[in-house]
Regions:
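Short, solvent-exposed loop/helix junctions and linker helices
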Residues: 12, 54, 120-121
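Generic alpha-helical secondary structure signal
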Residues: 13, 58, 93-96
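Short "lid" loop at the C-terminus of a central beta-strand within the Rossmann-like core
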Residues: 37-42, 54, 77-80
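A C-terminal cap/extension of S-adenosyl-L-methionine-dependent methyltransferases
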Residues: 76-140
Length: 140
């Protein structure tokens, strides 16, 4: 199931209900790809005017677990060069050096996407790959 760029256009109660409905209709073992902005703190302080509520990493991860999803993978998507610079400046020397080398080889448009992948909590956008456990009934 693909669920992308939608949950942020709903009130958080409705977004949570939509996730429950996804869980209900998924077959056991099925996966869902869920992407959305990552906005820690007050989700009503949105990055984009068209959005109603933007879930933060911890909040969304907890809600997915509460519903019953198993998290298969978490991926950071899209971040700005400035944010990546700030983030990597605080890391261990080897990681800082790796980032500095990558900046010299990779165009900024690709760098921001590539370097955000392993750090979903810090990324501007999230991709959660979740699964309905194989032992669950279809109408759980």
């Amino acid at each position: 199931m693909i669920y992308t760029s939608a949950i942020e256009h709903m009130h958080p109660d409705d977004g949570a209900k939509s996730l429950v409905e996804c869980y209900k209709v998924m077959k056991p073992g099925a996966k869902m790809f869920l992407s959305c902005p990552n906005t820690p703190g007050n989700g009503y302080n949105t990055q984009y005017r068209a959005h109603v509520y933007e879930w933060g990493y911890d909040e969304l991860k907890a809600k997915l677990a509460e519903i019953g999803f198993s998290i298969v993978q978490e991926v950071g998507l899209v971040s700005s060069v400035r944010e990546m610079d700030d983030f990597y400046a605080k890391q261990e020397p080897a990681l800082r050096d790796f980032y500095t080398r990558m900046k010299s080889y990779v165009p900024a448009a690709f760098l921001t996407a590539f370097m955000a992948i392993p750090f979903p909590r810090e990324a501007k956008e999230l991709l959660f790959i979740v699964q309905k456990p194989k032992g669950e009934s279809i109408n759980a």
